[in-house]
Amino acid sequence: TIDTGSNGIIKFTTEGSERLRILSDGKVLIGHTSNIFSYKLAVFGTDGGNSGISASRFSNNTSPASLLLSKSRSATIGNYAVLQNNDEVGMIDFRGADGSDNMSKVAEIKASVDGTPGSNDMPGRLTFHTTADGASTTTERLRIHSNGNISIQTNDVGFSGAGTLRI
C-alpha cells in the first residue's frame, strides 16, 4: 500500500507494517518513522540482519561490489570543481549510544587529498581515528600517505622505503 497523505510524506506498507517513508524534504527512512540523523538515507533496525546496507555482486569476473564516495568543490550538482590539498573526500563514521542519543563518536576512517590534484591525478591518503576513554572527539591514530608511507599516532613518517615492518 502506498499512502500519499496530505502531510507531504509518502509511506509504503506491506502486511499492515510501514516499510519505507519518504519525507517532504526527500529524505528516505527505512525501519523508522522519524529521522534522527541529517542524512538523505537512514536505515534503522533491531538486529544485524535488518540494520545494514548490502551491496552484492554476482559475476564470473574479478569485479567487486562497491560503495562510491565522491566530492567536488562546486556547490552545483553536476559541476566538477577541482579539489585542493587536505580536502576530505569521504568518511566512514562510527557512532554509539551514550544513554542520551546515538551520536557519540567512536571512530572514523577518512579519505583525503594528499597533494595537488591534476587531470586524472588525485593523490590520496587514508586516516584512522579513534576516541579515547573520557574524550568526546576522535584523534588520528594512523595515516597512510599517498606515497605509501605510514604514520602511527603522529603525522610524521615512522617507516619509509621498501621492505616489511613487523610490530
Language-model region placement:
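Trimeric beta-solenoid/beta-helix "fiber body" segments of extracellular/virion adhesins
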Residues: 1-105, 113-167
